[in-house]
Amino acid sequence: MKKLFIIPALLGAMFLTSCEDFLDVNKSKDSAITTSVDQVLPVATFYASQICYDHAEYGVYMCQALTTGGKSQTGSYPYSQGWEFLGVNRHPMWRRHFYDLGANINKMNEIAEEKGNRNAILIGRTVMLMSTMMTTDAFGAMPLSEVYKSNSPKYDSQAEIYEWMFKEADELLKLYQDPEWVKCPTNLLINQKMDRIYAGDMQKWETFCKALKARLLLRKLPNWKNTPEVCQEIIRVVDDALATWEEPRYYYPGGVTESNCPWGPYAPKINSWESRDNRLDESIPTTFFLHGILGSIDGTYQVSRGYALDPRAAKIMEPRNQISGMLHLESNIGMDINNTIADFPDLLTQSTKTNPWTSNTGYIALMTTEELMFIKAEAQFWGNDINGAYNTTVEATKENMKRYGIEEATLVDHALNQYKRFFEIKLPGAGQFTIADLMQQKYVAMYLQPEQWTDMRRYNYSSSQNGISYAAPGQTPVYVYDVKNVHNGTNALFAKDAANFNKTYSLHRPFNLYEAYWCTPEDYGVNATLSPNAWVNRLNADTETETKYNKKELEKNGYYTTNAAGEKILDYRILKKRLIWAQKNPAVVQCADDNIEWM
């Protein structure tokens, strides 16, 4: 994968000269190309935010929060179409990790080592820890130990990658406590233009590293290593991080191209061919997300009950039709011929400006405060502290509401009643609290965040559709993504009380999936509609580089099968293969079709 080192260096040079003012790179275009730490660091932090967007942009469709008006089985956007991934040309996050981040940060660290800029090395390694976790959680096995040592580096297993990440997190946290590193006399004087996240504040970067360790540890729940000791360690790490926490935000000033937040209306496409611009202007909230999770009320809008049970619904997206309420659509089912995109909510909230993520001058958070709080809540739940898990979930939900400008102390009249009604119906008390309640509220909080799809895969798309349910010992099993308390459609005046929220909506697969991959006998169950193996659990390695330069490693890792003609072809079943943290744990999971072996 030496090519992965040479090519990104050229891309980096092009990038540096294309956004001088934004990234504070002032350099004569006629001078020879040279690189210094203060030039690469702005690029590294920029791409740190960009890879968060890359993963979230795929994930928001894969976890069925958004869809489009189309219904194609195949196309260049398989994650919002029919899941035909093997024909896609490239995955942005693969290239972002190995090219834009890995190559540039490796070069930066080499120079920083020579110059004694140890603070820059710490930042670079922390960013790479984050990026490595995101990338392996999307693709599984991938190059790590030999990544830039040959054109065809070996693929490390996920077990090996996770072992490295845990060691790297612990080593980084020790170095952040070492004065010879954080107070080294030769450290670079880092300002806001070099580091738009923390302006070189090592304590803040250390705190973020603690948060990354908490995210790493969470991968052990609920399947991998679900023990009281792990739960207690997660709680300890989260509490330690929250004590000095400042959300790691990369703010965009607005202007042209990469100066705009990737989720904003400008929809910048970074480096053109290797990226994907956001499609919020042509996307639609799914029935699962808007009607199920957020509790939208179909029919004529009534101010006394609002557009939805969840007050965040009309902040996350902007209602555009009071007569029919907030319209939604099943995933990949296709828009009715009588509808246009203007009939559905504006996901960019261009008039109300109520969604902080979707502004050109918005920000990308490398991790949100709410995520940290929900990590703690999940550890409390599986550690059998149900009261603690409930209380933390309520506080995390309120924290997410604040992000959208919803605070109980500022609400009056119908808005206050709606706020109280939400908690009375969705989170009534610890006695009724389940892991489904927790994860459904985290699902809302992780909208447009990378963890949204990761969470759904950790819980194996648990619903009555695939018969996979979860429960701690002694608890009644629940389907994590079967949403209860869905409005029953009654349109009578004031039909807004708990009695009207009595339906259940189950997560199911998108419509019009690519039949050759997803409509085979192995996709259907006996006691449940779907097999446990009927979902996408990982992405295939980037086809632009890996099938060309590293085919032997792909073969070793199950990417190929032999057809009837004796030819080796890409095997679509790699998409169904679970990652290390999603394997079946009989202690916490039940399956309607227990005789079907999990892939």
Regions found by a protein language model. Give the residues of each.
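Sec-dependent N-terminal signal peptides
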Residues: 6-11
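C-terminal structural cap/anchor segments
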Residues: 385-472
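Structured, solvent-exposed acidic/aromatic patches
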Residues: 70-408, 428-435, 595-599
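Positively charged n-region of N-terminal signal peptides that target proteins for export
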Residues: 1-4
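Membrane-proximal, proline-rich intrinsically disordered regions
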Residues: 19-71, 96, 348-352, 468, ...
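Phosphate/oxyanion-binding loops and surfaces in catalytic or ligand/nucleic-acid-binding neighborhoods
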Residues: 47, 51, 244, 399, ...
